[in-house]
Amino acid sequence: MAAAAAVIPPSGLDDGVSRARGEGAGEAVVERGPGAAYHMFVVMEDLVEKLKLLRYEEELLRKSNLKPPSRHYFALPTNPGEQFYMFCTLAAWLINKTGRAFEQPQEYDDPNATISNILSELRSFGRTADFPPSKLKSGYGEQVCYVLDCLAEEALKYIGFTWKRPSYPVEELEEETVPEDDAELTLSKVDEEFVEEETDNEENFIDLNVLKAQTYRLDTNESAKQEDILESTTDAAEWSLEVERVLPQLKVTIRTDNKDWRIHVDQMHQHKSGIESALKETKGFLDKLHNEISRTLEKIGSREKYINNQLEHLVQEYRGAQAQLSEARERYQQGNGGVTERTRLLSEVTEELEKVKQEMEEKGSSMTDGTPLVKIKQSLTKLKQETVQMDIRIGVVEHTLLQSKLKEKCNMTRDMHAAVTPESAIGFY
């Protein structure tokens, strides 16, 4: 049904839900029927229609950049996080549509506080919420559909929306075209159904005034033409031919209407008689099958007891073997743990041994290798050569020093003789 066409919601479904939830403080909870599990799909479809009436696509989805939910969005689990966010967003928007200020929840808000605020607003409208708040955390289920449906109804009441009765279109029957010679006059009965609160019966009234006027005109014409009718000028053969030609057109065929309740009643009686006749034949077979199944189940039960009694000692042995197996497994686990520890220690010792071997090999190779001795000999030879060169240089230096000292001594002696000779000459003169 389109969103613009407002119809009356089925009150029986709403009553069934309220009875199933146990509305009221002292009202006892009524046992739910087999179709109660699928009732939330109906509530979800009604909720989508109510949201369309509230223009949620233009005012909410486009502004918040959200995709429209499907007709069973909150009835089936798809993505709990996304469904819970969509539920909180719709609930906040519906509460704002009722004229009350409610802050739009964000993703980082506490979900428990958000649910508590929504339920408190729902209870302020006089609605009951006798289910745990954790049912709304999943974002889907009967409780989620119930809360959103109640808020949508309150929003419709606030904007002054009223439900109207549905208007059914009148179906026009197609007229059949038949040949002129073999034509039959077909009268189709069109029933116009008017929904009234006082009565459900339908009556057809005949306009007696019209019939009376037609009869009066016929009597007047007959009285005016009495003189012409006194003498007949019609040929009997032509009259018979005309009667044979017009007779097929005078046949009236009443077309059966599938909407007629009498046809459905007849069908119900036929089905009832068929079911009763079939039940008489099948009841014996079903009783026989039931008895055979009961006897078979009794035999199976007795056989199970006999087998259990016969195999009781084997079961005890099996249990003992299971206990021994568990003990052996525990011992194996303990031994396996010790082996693992010893394997680790062995790997550490092996690693240290490899290191010692490597060091010994390095030292042995260094001891047996003659390269260092050759280098030492070469160094000693070089040192000797350098020592000889130093000795030669020292001798040259000593010789040079000795020559310089001797030369200096000679010079001093000569100077001394030169100084003594003039003094003696002066004394001589």
From Swiss-Prot:
It comes from Mus musculus. Disruption phenotype: Mice show randomization of the embryo turning process and heart looping, which are hallmarks of defective left-right (LR) axis patterning. Motile monocilia normally present at the surface of the embryonic node, and proposed to initiate the break in LR symmetry, are absent. Furthermore, defects in central nervous system development are observed. The Sonic hedgehog (Shh) pathway is down-regulated in the neural tube, resulting in failure to establish ventral neural cell fate. Present in retina and testis. In brain, it is present in the cortex, striatum, globus pallidus, hypothalamus and cerebellum. Present at high level in neurons and neuropil throughout the brain (at protein level). Expressed in hippocampal neurons, where it colocalizes with HOMER1 at postsynaptic regions. Required for the formation of cilia. Plays an indirect role in sonic hedgehog signaling, cilia being required for all activity of the hedgehog pathway. Has pro-apoptotic function via its interaction with HIP1, leading to recruit caspase-8 (CASP8) and trigger apoptosis. Has the ability to bind DNA sequence motif 5'-AAAGACATG-3' present in the promoter of caspase genes such as CASP1, CASP8 and CASP10, suggesting that it may act as a transcription regulator; however the relevance of such function remains unclear. Keywords: Apoptosis, Cell projection, Cilium, Coiled coil, Cytoplasm, Cytoskeleton, DNA-binding, Golgi apparatus, Transcription, Transcription regulation. This is Intraflagellar transport protein 57 homolog. The keyword Transcription applies. One of its GO terms (biological process) is left/right pattern formation. Pfam families: IFT57 (PF10498). One of its GO terms (molecular function) is DNA binding.
